[in-house]
Structure formats: C-alpha cells, structure tokens
C-alpha cells in the first residue's frame, strides 16, 4: 500500500487490519483496557504472546513492548466453524498492542473481512462482517 510522503508508515493501516493510536500510558494498563473493551463486545482472550520477551529469550534482542492477543467471540466462532470446519485455520482474531516510536501505543486489529475473503462461504462472510463491526466498536471505545 502506498502512503503519502508526510505520513509515517506506522500510521497507514494495512489492507489486512485497522488500528488506533493511544496516548502515552502504562503498557500493562493499556493491555487491561484493551482486554476489557474486547470483553464488552463478547471477546475473550485465548492466547497472549509476549513478542518482546520471546525475542529477548530466543534472539537476545531487546525490543519495545509488543503483545499479540488472540481474541475470540465464542458464539461467532461457533457459527463460522459450523459453516466451514476448516475456518479454524484463520482463527482467532489477532489484536496487537505495541509501543510506537514516540512512546504512544498502537492497537492493531486483524480485519476479519479481509482475512475471510479466502473463503467463498457466504455464512463465513456474514460472521466476518459482524466480527469487524464489533472490533471497530472496540477501536472506537479505546480512541
């Protein structure tokens, strides 16, 4: 995706996701806030990957705080899995919380509609649309 020359790459949403930028705040508190906003929309956290700790442990590289949250709405996941059993290959929805270069925080959301376009199943597409709406409400609640 091309970006305008005056817009940093980190501020241009990729075609496979969307994000919001939070002001500088404690990373742990931001994780709690993001998790609570997801819960309000029916999502639970199935996985949490601490990328910063993993890079330090495996490669000896110090990096900024970076977490990948595997978010799942059980009702919607059940609908998608019932419509297409192998859709689990594309689940759960990843939400990234990371520190930006300026010290603020970026919360990125996988766009389920973009990801689920790999299937032509209309029920999966309908579920993906509903998931996107809920994730966009999470983004709005955080902004």
What residues fall within each predicted segment?
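Short amphipathic alpha-helical/adjacent loop interface patches that line ligand
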Residues: 31, 73, 132-135
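A generic structural signal for well-ordered coil/turn residues at beta-strand boundaries
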Residues: 14-16, 65, 91, 103
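Residues at alpha-helix termini
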Residues: 40, 57-58, 141
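Terminal, regulation- and interaction-focused segments at domain boundaries
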Residues: 2-41
